[in-house]
Amino acid sequence: MKQAFVDKTVTVAVRDTEVPVPKPGQVLIRVVVSGTNPKDWKMAHWRPDAPPVNQGDDIAGYVEAVGEGVVGFKKGDKVAAFHEMLAPYGSFGEYAIAWEHTTFHLTSKTSFEGGKYEPRELTLRSH
């Protein structure tokens, strides 16, 4: 699969990588829409010694696979999720990994574009 990585000079490189396998409690999502936030390019300045990373955290797409113990989702479900910051396999790729507890179903009337904003908005409203 292809992923976009941002390095410390805020240069984006697209690389071929393996499709990840979800671990227990994780959901593998085939990305349809990915959001971007200021932290996606600022992180390179905040952590200049960090390796290039796929920084995208706002995901909307279809469940491709689930890890052991995941019961609320199955392949083909239309979902949105918040990716764990700084973890591998963010939303700037063909597939992304999210935790089950940060993933939720989208209704048939909810667009992927609208759905991808919900994880961040819910986080902001809870603080």
Q: What are the roles of these predicted feature ranges?
A:
Residues 18-35, 44-85:
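Glycine-rich beta-strand-centered segment in the early N-terminal region that forms part
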Residues 2, 15, 77, 93-94:
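Extracytoplasmic/periplasmic beta-strand context in beta-sandwich domains
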Residues 82-127:
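NAD(P)H dinucleotide-binding glycine-rich loop of Rossmann-like/cofactor-binding domains
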Residues 4-12:
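Extracellular beta-rich ligand/substrate-recognition surface
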